[in-house]
Amino acid sequence: MKQFKQFRTRTVLDDICEIHGCHLWSVKIPIRGKVEEISQCPECEKENIRRFEKQLNMESEVKSKLSDTYEVFARDSIVSSKLASKSLHDYEIRVDIDENAINFVKRLEREYAKGTVGNAIITGPSGVGKSHLTYGLARFLNEQFKSYDEPKSVLFVSVVTLFDKIRESFEFDNGYSEAKMVKLLSEVDFLFLDDLGKESRKADTKRNEWAHQIVFKILDNRTNTIINTNLSSEEIKELYADDFGNGALSSRIFEGATGRCFVYPSGMKDRRY
C-alpha cells in the first residue's frame, strides 16, 4: 500500500466550483504510467460516482431482465440442432399452401406483437414444414420483442424430447425434473410446443394419463401457446378425452385459438424428401 500513499494526498485550492460553491482539490493520480496533478470538485466527483453506480445498476437490471426473458430461448429451448438453424427467411415456398402458411405465421407475428392473447395451432401431416414455421416464428418473436426494448420469454420445446428428459430425471438428476419443467413451461410468455400428441401411445393408458396430466398442468396456467401437431381437431379431442382430461385438456389446447388455426391438406407430400 505504501507505493499508493502519494495518490491519497490532496491540497485544498483557493479556486471555487461554480456549481457547488466549494473549494477545489488538487490531487495526484496515475495516468498512463505518469503521475498527473488535477483539480477537481469533491461534490462533482461524488455526483460522478453516483451516476456511475446508477449506470451499473441499470446495466445489471437489463442483464437480469434479459436472462429471464430474451436469453431463455437459446438457453432453455429443447430443439434439434438441425431445426435450430432454421428461420422464417429460409422457409421455401414450393406450392400455394406454403405461401398461405407463411402468411398465417406473419399474421401471428403482428397479432402477438400487438399484445394479442390466445393460443394458435398449426396442424397437418408429417414433413410439411410445421416445425420449421413454428420455430421460425418463435425465433423471430424473441428478436422482435428485444428490438422493441420489451423482451419476452419465448420457449420452443419438442414435446417428445421433453417427456424423454422428464422420464430420464426419474433415474438421475439431469436438470429436467417434472416440477422444474412444469414451472418453466407454465411461466414463459410464449410457449411453442412441437409435435403435440407424439407424447401419447394408443395402447398405453397409464403412460398417457401421466403425460396428459403434465400437459394439463402447463396449459392450465398460461396463455399464448403456439402448437404444431399431426392431429386434426377431432383427433385432439379424442386423444385427450381420457379419464383425466374429460375434455378439459382439449379445451385448454384450443383456448383462444379461434381464427388462429392453420390446417395443411392431408395429402401433402413430405418436404424432406
PLM features: residue spans?
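GG-anchored amphipathic helix commonly corresponding to the ABC/SMC/Rad50 NBD signature/C-loop
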Residues: 135-141
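A short, basic N-terminal segment
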Residues: 1-99, 271-273
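Walker A/P-loop nucleotide-binding motif
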Residues: 116-135
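Pre-Walker A (pre-P-loop) alpha-helix and adjacent loop at the N terminus of AAA/AAA+ ATPase modules
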Residues: 90-120
